[in-house]
Each structure stands twice: as structure tokens, then as C-alpha cells.
């Protein structure tokens, strides 16, 4: 039997664990001094490929990134 007293504080605040861990990671990165801060910010970038499927076959993949296009 689970008790409400054992609920993690991030869940009690209405957050998911992923959003909580992202906030914690941002706080840690902001506390770093240079050059470690610049290195951490470059590792933060995410790139991924997205393919739509039609008739059971993947279409041409589209490369996406979380960084804004310049």
C-alpha cells in the first residue's frame, strides 16, 4: 500500500521526472565556470531524424535539431 507521504516532491509539484531532471541539469550547467560551461552547452544540443511512413515504407528522413536555425 503506497502512502501519499512517500510521493516524490517533483510528483507532488505536478511535474514529470523528465521535466524535473531537465530543470536540475539547467541549474547545474548555469553554475559551471568557463570553459566547462561552454563544453556542457555544446553537449546539450540534440539532433534526430524523423521519417514518415506511407504504404508500409519509410519516406525520406528529415533531420531535426533543437537548436534554432540561423
Curated annotation (Swiss-Prot):
Keyword match Acetylation: yes
Regions annotated as coiled coil: none
Example GO molecular function: proton-transporting ATP synthase activity, rotational mechanism
Subcellular location: Mitochondrion; Mitochondrion inner membrane
InterPro entries from the UniProt entry: ATP_synth_F1_esu_mt (IPR006721), ATP_synth_F1_esu_sf_mt (IPR036742)
Main localization, broad class: mitochondrion
The keyword Ion transport appears for this protein: yes
Function noted in UniProt: Mitochondrial membrane ATP synthase (F(1)F(0) ATP synthase or Complex V) produces ATP from ADP in the presence of a proton gradient across the membrane which is generated by electron transport complexes of the respiratory chain. F-type ATPases consist of two structural domains, F(1) - containing the extramembraneous catalytic core, and F(0) - containing the membrane proton channel, linked together by a central stalk and a peripheral stalk. During catalysis, ATP synthesis in the catalytic domain of F(1) is coupled via a rotary mechanism of the central stalk subunits to proton translocation.
Native organism: Arabidopsis thaliana
Modified residues (N-acetylalanine): 2
Top-level taxonomic group: Eukaryota
Record keywords, A-Z: Acetylation, ATP synthesis, CF(1), Hydrogen ion transport, Ion transport, Membrane, Mitochondrion, Mitochondrion inner membrane, Transport
Cystine pairings recorded for this chain: none
Annotated protein name in UniProt: ATP synthase subunit epsilon, mitochondrial
Gene Ontology cellular-component annotations: mitochondrial inner membrane; mitochondrion; nucleus; proton-transporting ATP synthase complex
Similarity comment: family membership: Belongs to the eukaryotic ATPase epsilon family.
Subunit composition and interactions: F-type ATPases have 2 components, CF(1) - the catalytic core - and CF(0) - the membrane proton channel. CF(1) has five subunits: alpha(3), beta(3), gamma(1), delta(1), epsilon(1). CF(0) has three main subunits: a, b and c.
Amino acid at each position: 500500500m503506497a502512502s501519499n507521504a512517500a510521493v516524490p516532491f517533483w510528483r507532488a509539484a505536478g511535474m514529470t521526472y523528465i521535466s524535473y531532471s531537465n530543470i536540475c541539469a539547467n541549474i547545474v550547467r548555469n553554475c559551471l565556470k568557463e570553459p566547462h560551461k561552454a563544453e556542457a552547452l555544446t553537449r546539450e544540443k540534440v539532433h534526430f531524424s524523423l521519417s514518415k511512413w506511407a504504404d508500409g515504407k519509410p519516406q525520406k528522413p528529415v533531420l531535426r535539431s533543437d537548436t534554432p536555425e540561423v
